[in-house]
C-alpha cells in the first residue's frame, strides 16, 4: 500500500508540477521576480494536497484533466504561503535548500510570495471558462475560503509566539491546525470531506512535528527548527502542561527571546523536558488516533465507490503518514 501511495504521489505530483509550469511567467524582471517565484514550485514537495484533489475527482468519475487546474491552483497557493511562512518563522531550510528569503532577501521573497498568490488565481479563472460560471465560480470561492482560513491559522500561531503564550490546550492546537492546513475551508455541504481532511491533515502535521526532532536529510528539514522558531507544537504544549513551575518559568524566558538569541543549551533543555514528560509517546498516540479517524471517515466517503487505484490511494494515506 505504501508503494501505491508513493507512486501515486509521484505521478500526480509530476502532472501538477507540469501544469504549474504552464502558468509560471517569464520575462523582465527575471532575476528579481520571475526566477524567485518559480523556485518553490520547482522544488520537490510531497504534493499531497493536489494528489488528493486529482484522486478524489477520478474516484468520483471525473478525469484527471478536469481536476488538474484546481490541483495546480492548490499547490501554487500552498507555495505562496510557504514563502511568507518561512519569513515569519525565520526558517532557513525548505525542501533541502535555503529558504527563498535566505537566497534573495526578505523584500524580494515577500514580493515573490505575493506574485504566487496572484498566480494561483489563473488556473481558477481557466476553470470558469471550461466548466462555466456556476461550477467555476464555486471552485474559486472554495479557494478563497482556503486562503482566508489558512491565514487565520497562521495569525493564531503568530499571536501565540508574539504574546509568548504557552499555556495551551490540545483543542487550541487542533483549532489552529484545522485552519492553517486549509481543511476547514468550504462554502458547500462537504462535511464528510472536511472531517476526513481535518483528521488526516492534523495527523500529518503532528507527525511532521515529530520528524522535526530528528529529521531525515531526505526531507530537507532543519534540525529542531520548530523549537528554534518557538512553534507551539503539540509536543511543546504537552511538555509545558506537565512541567514544574520552575521549568515553566524557564520555558517562558526562553521563548520570550528572539530566535537568534536561543542556543543549543536552550534546545537541549526543551528536548530533555519533552522526553522526560512523555510528550513524544503522547503525541505519537494522538497522531495515530487521528489517522484512525481519517481512515474511518475515508471508508464512509469512498467505500461505496467502485474499486479503483485512486480509492485505494486515499485509503492508504492514513498509514503512509507514518511510513514516509
Regions found by a protein language model. Name each.
Residues 1-324:
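All-alpha prenyltransferase/terpene-synthase fold signal
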